[in-house]
Amino acid sequence: VIFLTIIVRFYYGQEYNNTTFNLARMNMLLHDVNYTRFKIDNDDTLENPAFRGEKFDAVVANPPYSAKWSADPSFLDDERFSGYGKLAPKSKADFAFIQHMIHYLDDNGTMAVVLPHGVLFRGAAEGTIRKYLIEEKNYLDAVIGLPANLFFGTSIPTSILVFKKCREDSDNVLFIDASQSFEKGKNQNHLTDEDVDKIVETYRNRETIDKFSYCLLYTSDAADER
């Protein structure tokens, strides 16, 4: 989590893919997290959530982009989705993951999720969900545009969306364009330590930097555009 410093006493996670599930557990051990300090469930996060009734201080994810899911109408009665009036489409589960994560986020917690740019502008049900999150709840805290070809298996550009339920800066949203902040590698692009530090400091200070970041204040006109 690059946006805040916290003391983590216990880690919870859920991953459907067996290989990624095992890699996640190995990653914990390689970073000196004792097996008694984490619980990672191997199941479908959307269809069979593992930690009902829990709330978490920090929620982070890099879910599969625009994955298919059931979008079963019965989910409209599920507490994770019921307040929105719409479900993410079967062909794109991006907003279903966002809704799932927000449900499990503590009121004073921070959530960060990596998703393709389409979540920022697609319409229909996704537009309804996005409008509810921004206009009704005012949960969106920042959008950080990342370089293309940053993650293994995909070359598409992505964004980090940061959400908070109780925002200190509730009258604005910070936009950071870090799409040109990378070091080109043989097969993938990489964020350098300097790139990461600049993103983190810009987020913490909520600075407007020419051609890099902009803090959008919610005026009456901006509210109409949300």
Enumerate the predicted regions with their spans:
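Conserved S-adenosyl-L-methionine
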Residues: 3-9
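Short alpha-helix immediately C-terminal to the canonical SAM-binding loop
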Residues: 21
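A conserved structural/catalytic subdomain of Rossmann-like adenosyl-cofactor enzymes
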Residues: 49, 53-220, 226
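Conserved beta-strand segments of alpha/beta enzyme cores
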Residues: 10, 37-39, 142
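S-adenosyl-L-methionine
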Residues: 25-51
